[in-house]
Amino acid sequence: MFENYPFWYTFFTELKYQVVLSPTSTRKIYELGIESIPSESECYPAKLAHGHVTWLIRNGVKFIFYPCIPYERNEFPDAVNHYNCPIVTSYAENIKNNVDELNDPSITFRNPFLAFTSEEILANRLVEEFKDIPAEEVKAAVHKGWEEMAAARRDVQKKGEETLKYLEDTGRHGIVLAGRPYHIDPEIHHGIPDLINSYGIAVLTEDSISHLAPVERPIRVND
């Protein structure tokens, strides 16, 4: 959601779908889906997904799109890989098999396996998935979404550059708070960025400044 939403919103809007989001994560959202969580060992973002899907169902949404995405964009050509964790890769299968309300025949729950490896690979897969829509329309929507995703990333980078300049001009301090995209969710990050801000320290995400310097290799992690 937090990484690829610009793409999906643009893609579905171009195809004349109305995009409906569940509300911001809260404890109530978590509790809404707690009965369908199959294991306490799952990470909190996965548990929250049950509540978000349940909210959509109970608010009359009849078409829910929750793709399984093994591979993200290959942002750095010399990176070893660009795969997601097992939860992101296939958790929609867990949702499908544990949220009983999805058995309602009036609800369409679509969870295709897709790869964000490249625009071409993603477009070809979505053409297969949306066979009732002309292929050229699907490909055009993918292209628009891909451009919007790139523009959103440039906006993040621009803000990072602006923040660094502000720190240089004012002599203030900043911190790079690294994490996964879902750490933008206030229910998951528990207010840590706000706490840091309260001390007069700027918070930057790694993707807001990673373009400013090359990665020193070799590095001692599998990236």
Predicted feature descriptions by range:
Residues 1-223:
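An N-terminal assembly and electron-transfer interface module characteristic of large anaerobic redox
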